[in-house]
Amino acid sequence: MLQKVTGIVVRTVNYGESNKVVTLFTEELGKVAIMARGAKKPGSRFHASSQPFVEGVYIFPSSRGLAQLKSSDVMTSYPEIRKDVERMAYAMYWLELVDRSVEDRVQNRPLFRILQDALQALNAGMDADVITHYVELRILHLLGVAPVLTGCVRCGDVTDPMYFSVASGGFLCARHPEEGVILLSERLAKLLYLMSKHELSEFRNVPLSDESRVLLRQLFDAYMESYSGLRLKTKRVLDQMIRLHLNED
């Protein structure tokens, strides 16, 4: 019996002289690995459909083992992302984040749509940092360690000023001071709350000042390191690229 799925390539591993083991995050099955024979060869029928963050339709035998890809059809390769090295670095981080956060063959349509929406938004030119923090929040929710963004962790108060505490796992009000907290503007606190509740499309035109951008990166980097348990190579590459970009400016 053959299975037909819509999937996004989240990881590839070379196998032998010409083959690839391709890991797809699919709408129907969750994460699944398949063998794409000959995919390393530029002229092969599976070469295009086995590239990172390609979205396509894939057909392979139903099997608990490593199934062999029989047919594939590329829906989109997100060409605008591929034209820009920095955007590619963001996309690769999201792929590894999803890959490392989900188990094999556990369906998660909401997360598939989030990854799909993120790639579409990046391809359309949306702010990569806004998308990244949206994806990170959703992954933290999936892992069961999302920060409390509805009010003060201690008392539920929503009165400004609001602080963010990595140690306490979310917002803190001025009545519950703590060392190492990050002071948030009213706008940033509201943005974080809204990002935890709404679709990505709602934030398509959100402007970020340089100061806010640095603050959010600091906040999410510290929180992800403390709570996600993930140490990702693609995140280190992205951070190096961001630092290089800042030095050039």
From Swiss-Prot:
Q: Which GO terms describe its biological process?
A: DNA recombination; double-strand break repair
Keywords of this entry: DNA damage, DNA recombination, DNA repair
Indicate whether Magnesium appears among the record's keywords.
Answer: no
Matching entries from InterPro entries are given as: ARFGAP/RecO, DNA_rep/recomb_RecO_N, NA-bd_OB-fold, RecO, RecO_C
Which protein family is named in the record?
A: Belongs to the RecO family.
Function in brief: Involved in DNA repair and RecF pathway recombination.
SUPFAM superfamilies in the record: ArfGap/RecO-like zinc finger (SSF57863), Nucleic acid-binding proteins (SSF50249)
**Lineage of the native species?**
Bacteria, Bacillati, Bacillota, Bacilli, Bacillales
Q: What is this protein called?
A: DNA repair protein RecO
- HAMAP family assigned to the protein according to its UniProt record, in alphabetical order: RecO (MF_00201)
One Gene Ontology CC term in the entry: bacterial nucleoid
